[in-house]
From Swiss-Prot:
It comes from the Eukaryota. The lineage of its organism: Eukaryota, Metazoa, Ecdysozoa, Nematoda, Chromadorea. Its main location: membrane. It catalyses: glucuronate acceptor + UDP-alpha-D-glucuronate = acceptor beta-D-glucuronoside + UDP + H(+). Interacts with cmd-1 in the presence of Ca(2+). The chain crosses the membrane at residues 489-509. The gene is ugt-48. This is Putative UDP-glucuronosyltransferase ugt-48.
Length: 526
């Protein structure tokens, strides 16, 4: 018996358990999935994880984001306007806007405004705040989408904060942290511009980055004003709370990123949970995966609702499938999109579904390509499975994700408007993926690199979290640049002074010259 006890103790990892608050509003299923993976990994490591779920889209009773955490839904929020804005995103992506409208648009962001309104409704709920305080959380985890959670963490007395980038870090997040974002190398997240780029594209990229920082600053000011109004003028700036987080976890993989400057306390954890996910396929999917020369999967994620997209898109897509009758197509649409189901009637090589076991389908050896919106969860799953992709970005970070994939050679990038105006371009991309083995070779290499890393995403997350909490923070990793103002950080005061000196010299010489001329003997005689 003693030998058994000693053996058991030998194989157990001694870890101090901490109570962690995971701030995970139901603003998007894909974000809830990403947050849920982090929560489960921390719970598996022995921590008590509470998944705090303000119900922005009435999803808490319809979707389970984590298996090992304790869920804490917050229902009854006034979310009507937020849901309306979210549902309208799909239709808005096909409204073209010029660069000038983005630069000179000083209107408020309805999405962020409603997020702030629901945040205020929640943090001013005294009963809820008291319950949260009694939990005595050791750490807070929250995304970059909105800084409500940072203010909440401070309000309930959480000392250690971990800031999560749910996708590639935006220029505004990088700016908050004091990380340079070279506009000559890194394309603005919502454009398809290539880099390195000619002069005018770099100029456009730079101006769009500055406009984005301006817009994000406006949203931060709005959130700050809300907290100060309710909790006093000495309430700290939520951006300061965010940028002084102990660690920044980025839910991406460095191998998929456009390489850029970074910091020692920025840790990539892309790929969490992928090795344990996948599972089996039910009979319906097993049958279709065995048909024809292979299978092509089409999905635009959870935000781009196919019901609200222009009808021409699905019509053109169905026509494209008939150009490849030797291949089977699995097309995932919104469950209310009855029109797409009707369009597929009579097409023997097309299966339209409102749900697909995506990781399992991607892992199947007969899947030939994935037509995707370039959302980061989908890209991670594709890369981990070694599947070439055709990227049709719609919004947010998706265009930059697509550009990164194209640059690394395992996918083909297309413009979303080609779904309407130039379906031949989509057809051509499918042909290229099927006949050119280079894309599969690049995807296989990426798969090998991701799976053979010296340290897994799970190990990075757990070990770095434990390291911070067991040492009561790691101030030594805090970057001094994040405390500097804009002028000092970029040495603008020095540049302006240096640029002013020649001008001052010119003015002095000019005045001196005029003075000499006017005081000459000839002028005196006159």
């Amino acid at each position: 018996m003693l030998l058994r006890i000693l053996t058991f103790l030998a194989v157990c990892q001694v870890t101090t358990s901490h109570k962690i608050l995971m701030f995970s509003p139901t603003a998007s299923k894909s974000h809830m999935i990403s947050q849920g993976r982090i929560a489960d990994e921390l719970a598996n490591a022995g921590h008590e994880v509470v998944n705090f779920e303000p119900d922005f889209l009435n999803l808490t009773d319809k979707f389970v984001p984590c298996k090992k955490c304790r869920r804490w839904p917050v229902t009854g929020l006034n979310n009507y306007k937020f849901k309306k804005i979210q549902n309208g995103l799909s239709g808005d992506v096909f409204q073209q806007s010029s660069i000038w409208s983005k630069i000179f648009n000083t209107d408020s962001d309805p999405y962020q405004d409603e997020y702030t309104n629901m945040c205020e409704e929640m943090v001013t709920n005294k009963e809820l705040i008291e319950k949260l305080k009694k939990e005595k959380f050791d750490a807070y985890f929250g995304e970059q989408i909105h800084l409500c959670g940072m203010g909440l963490a401070h309000l309930i007395g959480i000392k250690h904060r971990f800031w999560i980038a749910s996708c590639t870090m935006s220029v505004s997040m990088r700016d908050s942290l004091g990380i340079p974002t070279p506009s000559s190398l890194i394309p603005f997240m919502s454009t398809l511009d290539a880099t390195p780029a000619p002069f005018w594209q770099r100029a456009k990229n730079f101006v769009l980055q500055m406009a984005h920082i301006r817009d994000e600053y406006r949203d931060v000011v709005l959130t700050n004003d809300m907290f100060k109004k309710n909790f006093g003028s000495d309430f700290p700036c939520v951006e300061f709370l965010a940028k002084t987080s102990d660690l920044i976890f980025v839910s991406t993989d460095e191998l998929l990123e456009i390489q850029a400057p970074t910091l020692s306390n920025v840790v990539h954890i892309g790929g969490l949970g992928l090795s344990s996910e996948g599972g089996g396929l039910d009979e319906k999917f097993v049958k279709i995966m065995e048909k024809g020369k292979g299978v092509i999967l089409f999905s635009l994620g959870t935000i781009a609702n196919t019901t609200n997209l222009p009808p021409t898109i699905m019509e053109n897509l169905m026509k494209i499938t008939q150009k490849f009758k030797d291949y089977e197509f699995i097309i995932k649409v919104d469950k209310f999109d009855r029109r797409s189901f009707d369009l597929a009637e009579g097409l023997s090589n097309v299966l339209v579904v409102d749900w697909v076991p995506q990781t399992a389908v991607l892992a199947h050896p007969r899947l030939k390509a994935f037509i995707t919106h370039a959302g980061y969860n989908s890209l991670m799953e594709s890369a981990y499975a070694g599947v070439p992709v055709i990227l049709i970005p719609f919004m947010f970070d998706q265009p930059r994700n697509g550009r990164s994939v194209e640059r690394k050679g395992w996918g083909i990038l297309r413009d979303r408007f080609q779904l309407i105006k130039d379906p031949d371009a989509i057809e051509g991309a499918i042909k290229e993926i099927l006949v050119n083995p280079t894309y599969q070779e690049k995807a296989n290499r990426l798969k090998k690199l991701m799976r053979s890393k010296p340290q897994s995403a799970s190990e990075r997350l757990v070990k770095m979290t434990n390291w911070v909490l067991e040492n009561d923070g790691v101030e030594e990793l805090q970057y001094e640049g994040k405390h500097m103002d804009f002028f000092t950080f970029y040495n603008l005061d020095i540049i302006i002074t240096a640029a002013s000196i020649p001008v001052l010299i010119f003015i002095v010489l000019r005045i001196s010259n005029i003075s000499i001329i006017t005081s000459s003997p000839k002028n005196k005689k006159d």
